[in-house]
Curated annotation (Swiss-Prot):
Induction: Expressed late during infection in a Rev-dependent manner. This is Virion infectivity factor. It holds the Pfam family Vif. Signal peptide: none annotated. Its main location: host cell. One of its GO terms (biological process) is viral life cycle. Residues 40-44 are annotated as: Interaction with host APOBEC3G. Vif-defective viruses show catastrophic failure in reverse transcription due to APOBEC-induced mutations that initiate a DNA base repair pathway and compromise the structural integrity of the ssDNA. In the absence of Vif, the virion is morphologically abnormal. Residues 54-72 are annotated as: Interaction with host APOBEC3F and APOBEC3G. The keyword Repeat does not apply. Homomultimer; in vitro and presumably in vivo. Interacts with viral RNA and Pr55Gag precursor; these interactions mediate Vif incorporation into the virion. Interacts with the viral reverse transcriptase. Forms cullin-5-RING E3 ubiquitin-protein ligase complex (ECS complex) by interacting with host CUL5, RBX2, elongin BC complex (ELOB and ELOC) and CBFB/CBF-beta. Within the ECS complex, Vif interacts directly with host CUL5, ELOC and APOBEC (APOBEC3F and APOBEC3G) substrates. The gene is vif. GO terms for cellular component: host cell cytoplasm; host cell plasma membrane; membrane; virion component. The modification Phosphothreonine is found at residues 96, 155, 188. It comes from Human immunodeficiency virus type 1 group M subtype G (isolate 92NG083) (HIV-1).
């Protein structure tokens, strides 16, 4: 029988981002308890030799699996060293690859307090309304007028440590033009 290949979209990331992601996930699973129901799988619990960790995030009847890899083909720069992340959405027997922004949006829909379009209706019904969003990485579009008004009223408080963002984990830092300065410290040059 011939070899069968399976192609998986893997976002090339810095190994320090993977360490930060893992520590943030563990903190919010075990210390702050904001990531209830999340499951962390260590590298020694996986059958695949290139998988360094897995985070299973339940979303009602579906699951989001964020899998980090090591020992992949080395990148263009020294610090990339073959580390990557894949994001998979599973529901029963169906699974598909998704991008980091969609993953953040899905996490935002099911976890963490947020001021949303339904907040005015909740306030009229006498329910508690959260005036801020705990997971701003999940907002990938311009907010509603009510959300923007609430944001202007409430001063944002920085969360320490921040909530884990898949978009931040898989952010492309290498292809952005680097800002450099000439010998007189004038920001006239752009990557040259």
């Amino acid at each position: 029988m011939e070899n069968r290949w399976q192609v998986v979209i893997v976002w090339q990331v810095d190994r320090m981002r993977i360490r930060t992601w893992n520590s943030l996930v563990k903190h919010h699973m075990y210390v702050s308890k904001k990531a209830k129901g999340w499951f962390y799988r260590h590298h020694y619990e996986s059958r695949h030799p290139r998988v360094s960790s897995e985070v299973h995030i339940p979303l009602r009847d579906a699951t989001l699996v964020v899998r980090t890899y090591w020992g992949l083909h080395a990148g263009e720069k020294d610090w990339q060293l073959g580390h990557g992340v894949s994001i998979e959405w599973r529901q029963k027997r169906y699974s598909t690859q998704i991008d980091p922004n969609t993953a953040d949006h899905l996490i935002h829909l099911y976890y963490f307090d947020c001021f949303s379009e339904s907040a005015i209706r909740k306030a009229i019904l006498g329910e508690i309304v959260s005036p801020r969003c705990e997971y701003p990485a999940g907002h990938n579009k311009v907010g509603s007028l009510q959300y923007l008004a609430s944001k202007a009223l409430v001063t944002p408080t920085r969360k320490r440590p921040p909530l884990p963002s898949v978009g931040k984990l898989a952010e492309d830092r290498w292809n952005k033009p680097q800002k450099t300065r000439d010998h007189r410290e004038n920001p006239t040059m752009n990557g040259h």
